[in-house]
């Protein structure tokens, strides 16, 4: 990643939750501060590293975006651990290549879930701590199923706790989590938003 002119600082997620320091859960947080008072926004890429569009979109913000007011936080590898492996039995590549005007660039292709080296074994049934919802055991390593996280929870829950701490401490006004879907997936081209934010989410379609 080549930070663009809009990037004013780079911190690690462990800045907000020190227990992540030195682990595969720690990850870069790029800060783009306009210097003008305004709202703050967090963009997450790489929640599922086998969905490269979300990651690449976050990288483009880091390299090209220059906010006119307020502050933008971008985490391109939200689940950094999942970038260190691929999904078994899926014949997934470890990297992919993009031709650019400055030559070929390559990017890591990862897994949908935290590397089992960092968190194992999976339970038969995963009970989401905050809601009590029961899910498939493999979902225990899915970053999107671990919010708001816990300090005494799984490795994945500790990552989401760090992200939640960032949101709380920096008083983030809005968070966008970037994903990708295959063409045959039933929710392709979908935006999932809280009922209080549906109007704002609809604006992203235009």
Task: Set out the residue ranges of the language-model regions.
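Di-metal (Zn2+ and/or Mg2+/Mn2+) metal-binding site signature of metallo-dependent hydrolases
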Residues: 48-56
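Short glycine- and acidic-rich boundary segments immediately preceding or forming the N-terminal edge
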Residues: 1-29
